[in-house]
Amino acid sequence: CTEAAATVQGVRQALQGQTLAHIVNTHLHSDHCGGNAALQAAWPQVQTWVAPGQLALVQAWDPVGLSYAPTGQRCPQFRADGVVQPGATVQLGLRDWQVHAAPGHDPHSVVLFEPQRRLLISADALWERGFGVVFPELEGEQAFAEVEATLDVIEQLQPEWVLPGHGSMFSDVAGALAVARKRLADFQADPQRHAQ
């Protein structure tokens, strides 16, 4: 949220004079959607999509249901215009992107896969050295199996490049999956390690 101006400037530079048409949120943790309000202010016509199960929470702006209040996150209020539905294909930047459910880090998470270039936007489902904290587990809900299923989906997609939610783009997908699976196995064997 504190980097909203930099986000707008970066998007403006990347668009090179074009209009921002869509904001697609992989999940609604504030470090991923905290710039939405600023982007909507800069491009008022932009369509903003969120994962299923979160549309009503955003439209009613429920900071508790969105987990901002309980976790101490700050996120400026933004509007949601629609849902990015797992199983759908969305056109972004003249390319067709497949939407895949990716629960684990967040129960509503999605990843986006562009099959022509074999590019995966993995959000926090896969990083080069692991994956994001499995928040449902911290709240007493079982979610390690969902992380494993999400890693299986990513492996089946066979991306050549991964653009993670944190860190640099990478191409050693097999290596990243191996690290993630090892980390997951460690957490499953000793859940207290995950909570630290």
Indicate residue ranges for each PLM-predicted region:
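Active-site HxH/HxHxD metal-binding segment of metal-dependent hydrolases
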Residues: 2-92
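C-terminal regulatory/interaction regions
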Residues: 193-196
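Metallo-beta-lactamase
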Residues: 2-3, 96-187
